[in-house]
């Protein structure tokens, strides 16, 4: 009886962690784990999604992150779109988290493995002791040259690269989602440390430099930093989120002026 009681308590605690994580950000929404799909087209589609996710190899998804952390990749990265600068790894982590929250044990196992590997990458970046690398969890190619010049206001490498912050945002979101949907505390810690990196890497830039930098596709950096503020109530995250708000776009829209013609929908919309 004691064993059964302890088991029930542990299960209840795990479920409450997931619920608390989601309610921390989305108080008007119910947790994914509260829904059980019955046989039908929605369950069929969900199961197909999971089956497709499980065809991928986590070590190949993680290869860009290990490489940029100075660690030997365990397997070669995927080619083509899946290997484009490492950003698909963040998408993959989000997908694992969402499906783990619906009860997929294999997705949960893979999610936890990826988080453990990303912890190794962050630790390796911290051991480098370089001014750009502390708390970095990115897989962007040539990260050392890119971010060491970027933090000084030199955007020559940044603008010559394929959408660095768009890329990194996917891993910010993946780590957040692993905590948000599954209550994974290690993912939460990694997410907040990565947000600390974003605060630090932009701290020396003027408002004018930030606005210029945001002319390059930058994903939802303002969103994830605002989420970090909602989680911790630490003002530094909200301040940084506001710096990532592209005023050239948002100011006219706040005044009901349409400024979207000829802009890139995936960036501005």
Q: Can you annotate each of these PLM segments?
A:
Residues 19:
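Conserved binding-pocket/active-site segment within a compact domain
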Residues 13:
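Active-site/pore-lining binding-face segments in mid-to-C-terminal subdomains
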Residues 1-10:
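Sec-dependent signal peptide recognition
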Residues 22-269:
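Glycan-recognition and catalytic cores of secretory/periplasmic carbohydrate-active enzymes
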């Amino acid at each position: 009886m004691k064993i059964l009681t302890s088991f029930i308590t542990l299960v209840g605690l795990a479920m409450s962690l997931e619920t608390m994580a989601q309610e921390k950000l989305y108080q008007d929404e119910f947790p994914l784990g509260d829904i059980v799909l019955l046989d039908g087209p929605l369950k069929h589609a969900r199961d197909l999604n999971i089956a497709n996710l499980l065809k991928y190899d986590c070590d190949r998804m993680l290869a860009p992150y290990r490489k940029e952390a100075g660690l030997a990749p365990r397997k070669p990265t995927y080619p083509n779109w899946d290997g484009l600068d490492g950003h698909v790894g963040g998408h993959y982590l989000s997908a694992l988290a969402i499906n783990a929250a619906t009860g997929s044990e294999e997705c949960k196992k893979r999610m936890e493995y990826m988080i453990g590997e990303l912890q190794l990458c962050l630790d390796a970046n911290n051991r480098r002791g370089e001014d750009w690398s502390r708390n970095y969890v990115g897989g962007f190619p040539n990260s050392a040259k890119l971010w060491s010049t970027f933090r000084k206001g030199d955007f020559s490498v940044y603008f010559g690269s394929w959408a660095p912050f768009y890329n990194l945002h996917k891993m910010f979101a993946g780590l957040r989602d692993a905590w948000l949907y599954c209550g994974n505390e290690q993912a939460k810690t990694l997410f907040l440390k990565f947000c600390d990196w974003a605060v630090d890497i932009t701290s020396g830039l003027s408002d004018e430099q930030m606005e210029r930098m945001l002319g390059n596709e930058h994903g939802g950096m303002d969103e994830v930093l605002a989420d970090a503020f909602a989680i911790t109530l630490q003002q530094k995250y909200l301040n940084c989120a506001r710096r990532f708000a592209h005023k050239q776009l948002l100011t006219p829209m706040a005044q009901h002026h349409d400024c979207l013609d000829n802009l890139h929908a995936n960036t501005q919309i």
